[in-house]
């Protein structure tokens, strides 16, 4: 009988502690809640200074997080055809890390010329893996529009002038 009472009490304490933990989880950390609700909850917990800091870069390609709320830094990178090697915070020179290297993929016009969506998927997966390895949160590319003018200095980041071809090649790239 004592054993049953002890097991019952233990089960009650365990259930109560699990229930209390789930109630204490902030809405912004609850993956089951809608994104809009999570964003509103996170914003309501942030100070004005923290909000301003998040929309103002702390260096090239980086915005600070809010460590007290568990919100990580945001790291961006150029790279619709390869992840940029690390650069110095105060100038555009390469950081010169001896353990730093990157894969330079062919420009997206070359990828589009293959007319191969499976290749675009593999290309996107490869870039995504390198971005994750380098702890990059946002990839600045690819350009998903079509060429509008030959004078656009970023045309190499697009997949050409043909909207049909672009749509067939960009989607698997992004999914990758």
Locate the predicted segments by residue:
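Bacterial Sec-dependent N-terminal signal peptides
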Residues: 1-24
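N-terminal beta-rich core of secreted/periplasmic extracellular enzymes
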Residues: 21-176
């Amino acid at each position: 009988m004592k054993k049953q009472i002890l097991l019952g009490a233990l089960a009650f304490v365990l259930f109560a502690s699990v229930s209390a933990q789930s109630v204490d989880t902030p809405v912004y950390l609850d993956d089951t809640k809608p994104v809009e609700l999570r964003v509103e909850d996170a914003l309501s917990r942030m100070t004005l200074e923290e909000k301003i800091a998040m929309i103002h870069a702390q260096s090239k390609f980086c915005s600070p997080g809010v460590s007290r709320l568990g919100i990580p830094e945001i790291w961006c990178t150029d790279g619709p055809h390869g992840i940029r090697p690390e650069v110095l915070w105060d100038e555009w020179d390469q950081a010169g890390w001896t353990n730093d290297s990157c894969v330079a993929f062919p420009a997206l016009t070359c990828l589009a010329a293959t007319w191969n969506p499976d290749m675009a998927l593999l290309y996107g997966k490869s870039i995504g893996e390198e971005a994750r390895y380098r702890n990059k949160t946002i990839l600045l590319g690819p350009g998903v529009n079509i060429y509008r003018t030959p004078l656009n200095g970023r045309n190499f980041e697009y997949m050409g002038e043909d909207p049909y071809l672009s749509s067939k090649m960009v989607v698997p790239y992004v999914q990758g």
